[in-house]
Amino acid sequence: MDEFREASSVSSSPSTPLRTPLHSPNLFNGDFSVSNRFSFKSSSDYSLSSSFSNGLCSPEDSSSPFSSPPFNGIIPKHNHTSSSPVSFDSLFFKDHEKSHVNGTDDLGLCEDLYRMNIKEDVEEDQIRYARTETLKDPLPKSDHTDFTPDPLYNFSPKHYEPSNGGFVSGGFPYGFFRPPKESSINQSCASWSGFDQSKNDDKRNMFGNNPQQFGWPSYSSSNSGTSPYNNGQEIFENRGGMREYSAYSPPHQPEVSYKHQNYRTTTSDILPLFCQRTQVPMVSKCSEPFSSDESFFMNGKSIDHQRSNTRALMSNNGNPTEICHPSLPNMCDIQGYVYLMAKDQHGCRFLQRIFDEGTSVDAMIIFNEVIAHVVELMMDPFGNYLMQKLLDVCTEEQRTQIVLVATEEPGQLIRISLNAYGTRVVQRLVETIRSGKQISLVKLALRPGFLDLIKDLNGNHVIQRCLQCLSTEDNKFIFDAATKFCTEIATHRHGCCVLQKCIAYSMRQQREKLIAEISRNSLLLAQDPFGNYAVQFVIELRIPSAVAMMLAQLKGHYVQLSMQKFSSHMVERCLMHCPESRPQIVRELVSVPHFDQLLQDPYANFVIQAALAATKGPLHASLVEVIRPHSILRNNPYCKRIFSRNLLKK
């Protein structure tokens, strides 16, 4: 920009004409062969404001910058060679006297040409760019699907190999389409690129005949027909040039003109979406939209509904063309690939679509190919969704066969349940099993690993699903194990939650055993970060025998428990739900020699507030009588809650 500003200032001086790149001898210090064609127009054809926008203008006559003598010469072609490196220091500036010898410059140009407007012959190309060509013929239809271009999908010139997400150009998944057996597109590469080769020859780079040396595009003049498939990797590729068909072209790019003949595609030309990397979501019309990244499991959603929501219209010579999803291919085409498809992000969705829309024969083909890989697919990031779907739609005999394979080896079902993906399938298995044989096999497989399952982040959900879906009798093995390992389970992060579920779903003797075991260990559990929840749960049940046993365990320890973070919650729960515990708790609190320490304790102050709210009559008065002498502590961060409320006036 600085060079152009300096050039502009020079052009305003009549004594120093503007030096264009062609006037600088330093520009041609390298071994270059120059062959350029330019069109020249008089400066008088342009206004002062447009002289630099349309070309380079340099008047020498200050009185009339627009006047110029007529041009009567022809530009000679010269070859300039030099061993010195190319220098651009004098691109626009050169001494006028040294540059002009006998009225000519280094290139042999007459001085009168300095006042001419020099510009490239781009007007015809601009007209060519501005002209919009409509599609002469629609894309051919096949027996399988309408293969009409969608304006939302761009057939870009880039090649996307499997390492780039499993896509080739055009947005189609790599490997999804096999090259058609008979296909041809009689299309001139020149019309693909939108440029005339004869014009392109006129625009060679000034430094040589290599059009790409300084970034100019190259266009081939080959008129040979092209195929929409190039070794199964490129769709509508222009083999002779850099430009390809784009469903949407910006205003500055030429539109496409093409014809198609003898193009046919059958269902046998379809390959499944597998054996490719699947990090990049599909953008072709063959994929089904999902609302979230986790929605790999298609729960009974018909593909007809999705197809109706993805219609699109585009103008083709004024005729609307409908674009829709292709129909499902014949299962014979994907037979032998189902196992690999099940482990693919898009393949598992495709197979789920077959379950929704296909026949029982199609489901049988899928089942027969995955039954030998049940364990692996259950723990696969994508295969687990297919297994969940299969458990929903399969027959009882098929479900029994799945259970037999999953429980064939000892500890195998436990290992699946501990897996982040496998736990989903095992939970779905528990939901769908009906026969006694299926339930018995699952129970026998889970029983040895009960303690590991109940403590695991993933495995504990399998136990909870058993409690929800199986009968009380079938869950007896869970209740017995929970009673046996009650303390160990109650003091675990995940186990304490499952233990509460066990109490909620158990009946009669099993429930009594669990509650009795918690009550006997209430003092220990009350001080545990997780065990205190089990004690609070039993207190809220208000079972007299359990409460009596628990209060006997806690008697004499209320002051100590009130000053601890976790057990203080349990003491508050006793004051709220166990009226028989209130006198004992209040007596122990007021008998403390240094009661002011309880008032200022970060946890005990909550117990005192709960005692003031829960007690009445003489019991409440005895507590207030101990609190009033310490009113000086009302500004204490913990005590002010006691004195600021109306608890003392109750």
Swiss-Prot record:
Residue ranges occupied by any PUM-HD domain in the UniProt entry: 308-650
MF GO annotations: mRNA binding
UniProt transit peptide range: 1-77
Composition-biased stretches (Low complexity): 8-22, 217-232
GO BP field: regulation of translation
Annotated region described as Disordered, given as residue ranges: 1-22, 200-235
Recorded GO CC terms: chloroplast; cytoplasm
Chief site of localization: plastid
Domain remark in the UniProt entry: The pumilio repeats mediate the association with RNA by packing together to form a right-handed superhelix that approximates a half donut. The number as well as the specific sequence of the repeats determine the specificity for target mRNAs.
The protein, known as: Putative pumilio homolog 7, chloroplastic
Organism: Arabidopsis thaliana
Originating gene: APUM7
